[in-house]
């Protein structure tokens, strides 16, 4: 270790303020397999060198503070401190740098996403020496991954539970999201499920409001599930949102869902919190419930390119905390999401081993050592004309979720569900025959319209609906 960066408590305590880079900028450091590695996009204040800014991030997110303290001598800072070990300028940005920081594993409580984030993205984001700060990616070491249960069941177990293979799953968010009575809500679910969807969904802000209390909703949705299963011979589900004001109330709702015998429940993991989410994921594994995760509030955290936390980090955190599905954007719909960035974190959700690939925004190689995978959910402003692109982009291990794209059908919910199911089956059949969905997608849908009046009506309604807005968060060139 460089004499400049070694913490020498033995020479005695010397009060005062010293530059962070003297202790926390260590370009000669060789990272360990057990280190948690972080890539930060740092925008220093004018006059602050990048080395000082990177070192400040490492210090303030580990053992450092603004001044020397005598209690430094009571421990080994060299063992516990974070280290900024590499800095690179961001192409095309005069004042932005990617600063790489290594954290020793001993800094983190086992199995706690809450503790990991409290350390890495805690006070440092308000640090005055930085104009902006964004956590772009984390490398979670194998030793830390193994302290997490992860998703309650994972992709293969879900397929086996549902007995559905070889195609994406279809879902629908019930609209209007607020204001329906429980009985009318259940009726809407039933119509969608009997029409051919695999799932219906509570919207993220449906909890237990005066117009529809949670217990009533659970009962009517369970009735819809069982009735549609009896009619279609397929296993159906509804994402019953168990999110609540307290963990105790959340668990009470999860227990009631299990007693009803439904296959899946739901949680808003960012607004509900990682501690609550991990507890719920453990309960779901122990009791055979699938867990659908909504990412409400994510864009507050991840949308701005130079400040916040990138969604690929939030996706990794969810895989550790636990969830069988998570919303991932659509690339083609109404919500933010560049194709290569989206496919990068979709791989981080589903695959077991993901190589570093900066062209898709992946800063580190990640080994999940067989932690179960998470199914990405494409949802937001999509309709039947998007089906070929969605099937091509997301593949079989995904949920394609059409809210307005089902309920907005001119003939009603069930025909809307039929249209989506026919479009999906046509795309899967064409893909399996070797046709190019990206090039022939519209033709495939038009061919299917000839033998499905429901699909033809849907195509007519949404033939001119597009969302042509550039993504805010794009890859560095």
Curated annotation (Swiss-Prot):
Give the InterPro entries listed for this entry. RuBisCO, RuBisCo_large_chain_AS, RuBisCO_lsu_C, RuBisCO_lsu_C_sf, RuBisCO_lsu_fd_N, RuBisCO_lsu_N_sf, RuBisCO_lsuI
Name the cofactor(s) required for activity, per the record.
Mg(2+)
Q: Which SUPFAM superfamilies match?
A: RuBisCo, C-terminal domain (SSF51649), RuBisCO, large subunit, small (N-terminal) domain (SSF54966)
Enzyme class label: lyase
Enzyme Commission no: 4.1.1.39
Residue positions annotated to bind substrate are: 123, 173, 177, 295, 327, 379
NCBIfam families according to UniProt? PRK04208.1 (NF003252)
Q: What does the record give as the function of this protein?
A: RuBisCO catalyzes two reactions: the carboxylation of D-ribulose 1,5-bisphosphate, the primary event in carbon dioxide fixation, as well as the oxidative fragmentation of the pentose substrate in the photorespiration process. Both reactions occur simultaneously and in competition at the same active site.
Protein family (similarity comment): Belongs to the RuBisCO large chain family. Type I subfamily.
The name this protein carries in UniProt is: Ribulose bisphosphate carboxylase large chain
Q: What is the lineage of its organism?
A: Eukaryota, Viridiplantae, Streptophyta, Embryophyta, Tracheophyta
Q: Which gene encodes it?
A: rbcL
């Amino acid at each position: 270790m460089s004499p400049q960066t070694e913490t020498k408590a033995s020479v005695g305590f010397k009060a005062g303020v010293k530059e962070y880079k003297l202790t926390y900028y260590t370009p000669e450091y060789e990272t360990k397999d057990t280190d948690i590695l972080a890539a930060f996009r740092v925008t220093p204040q004018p006059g602050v060198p990048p080395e000082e800014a990177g070192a400040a991030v490492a210090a303030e997110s580990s053992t450092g503070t603004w001044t020397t303290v005598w209690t430094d001598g009571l421990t080994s800072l060299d063992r516990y401190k974070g280290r900024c070990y590499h800095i690179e300028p961001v192409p095309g940005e005069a004042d932005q740098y990617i600063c790489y920081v290594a954290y020793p594993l001993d800094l983190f409580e086992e199995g706690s996403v809450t503790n990991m984030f409290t350390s890495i993205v805690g006070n440092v984001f308000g640090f005055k020496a930085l104009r902006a700060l964004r956590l772009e990616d984390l490398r979670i070491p194998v030793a830390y991954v193994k302290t997490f249960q992860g998703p309650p069941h994972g992709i293969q177990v879900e397929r086996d539970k549902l007995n559905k293979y070889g195609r994406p799953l279809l879902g629908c968010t019930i609209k209007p999201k607020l204001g329906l009575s429980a009985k009318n809500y259940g009726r809407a679910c039933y119509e969608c499920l009997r029409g051919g969807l695999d799932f219906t969904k509570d919207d993220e802000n449906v909890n237990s409001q005066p117009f529809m209390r949670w217990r009533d909703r659970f009962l009517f949705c369970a009735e819809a599930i069982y009735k549609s299963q009896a009619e279609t011979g397929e296993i159906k589900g509804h994402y019953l949102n168990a999110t609540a004001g307290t963990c105790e109330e959340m668990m009470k709702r999860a227990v009631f869902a299990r007693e009803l015998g439904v296959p899946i429940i739901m949680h808003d993991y960012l607004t509900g919190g990682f501690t609550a989410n991990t507890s719920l994921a453990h309960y779901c594994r122990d009791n055979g419930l699938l867990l659908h995760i909504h990412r409400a509030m994510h864009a507050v955290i991840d949308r701005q390119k130079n400040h916040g936390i990138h969604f690929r980090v939030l996706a990794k955190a969810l895989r550790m905390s636990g969830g069988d599905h998570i919303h991932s954007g659509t690339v083609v719909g109404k919500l933010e999401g560049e194709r290569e960035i989206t496919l990068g974190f979709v791989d981080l959700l589903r695959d077991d081993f993901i190589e570093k690939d900066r062209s898709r925004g992946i800063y580190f190689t990640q080994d999940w050592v067989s932690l179960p995978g998470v199914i990405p959910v494409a949802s937001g402003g999509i309709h039947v004309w998007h089906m070929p692109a969605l099937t091509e982009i997301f593949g079989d291990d995904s949920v394609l979720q059409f809210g307005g794209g089902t309920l907005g059908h001119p003939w009603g919910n069930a025909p809307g569900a039929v249209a989506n199911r026919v479009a999906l089956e046509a795309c899967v059949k064409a893909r399996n025959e070797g046709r190019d969905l990206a090039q022939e997608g519209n033709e495939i849908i038009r061919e299917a319209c000839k033998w499905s009046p429901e699909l033809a009506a849907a195509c007519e309604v949404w033939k001119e609906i597009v969302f042509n807005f550039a993504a805010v968060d794009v890859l560095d060139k």
